[in-house]
Amino acid sequence: MIIIAERINGMFTDVKKAIADKNKKVIQDLAKRETDAGASYLDVNVGTAAADQEGTIQWLVETIQETCSTPLCLDSQKPDVIAAGLKVINAENGVLLNSTPLNKKSDEEVFDKYVEMANQAGPKANLIALTMDKNGVPQDTDTRVAIAAEIVSKAMEKGFDTQRLFIDTIVLPVKVPNAQSQPGNILAAMDQIKYLSDPAPHMTIGLSNLSQGASERSLINRVFLAMAISRGLDSAIADVFDQALMNVVATSDLLMDKQIYSDSFLKVYNSVNKG
């Protein structure tokens, strides 16, 4: 399971303040703790913390790389911000570009730009593509699958290996009116997306979005994560500091026959996957 740690994001108060103060220690401590907690990638998102998003993402990347070699996930839907981050990143460790819709009303070719940047960054550069187009986030299963199919088709046309492609089916907050049917629609879409190519694209979600504003956030996230893994999900942007959630990842590996059973399977998983 590929876990993308979510906390280095300017939407969080401590990170926003660290960016404003240029406090490297806060960012570096977060990067170390997320790595130690089992992160495969560290998400790096300026959020609303700075007007100069290009300069800020470069500062974040350089700050993290001073003390940490965990691959980074550059998180912005602005191609110029991603390009700025790529100028200073060590892509040999691996990098994930997060993320592009299929297209936007203001930019029909945005997907092509992200594929080009991923290709230029090297063979260890992967790409997250959203099942979203110029009409926004789809509300039904069939449209999600159709957009995913077009994403896969366009990637293959450009010679982009589908093993480097992550399809994000976009989870919405379950608390939002009329959104409670969406988790079921997403699971049904996952059932089909995993068959769109051979090899199949990865599937990922921004897990914490599901429980935004809700009570029992960790419980909601854990249950849906287990359900989605059973449908083929192999990646999530998530809170690696939620140990109960990480235990779901470990147990899912066991039940999906990716780990040999032992009475100490959680300990074994942690020893292998945590820094």
Feature-to-residue mapping (PLM):
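Active-site cofactor/substrate anionic-group-binding motifs, chiefly glycine-
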Residues: 25-26, 57-104, 108
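Glycine-rich, proline-tolerant flexible connector loops at the mouths of alpha/beta enzymes
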Residues: 35-70, 171-179, 183
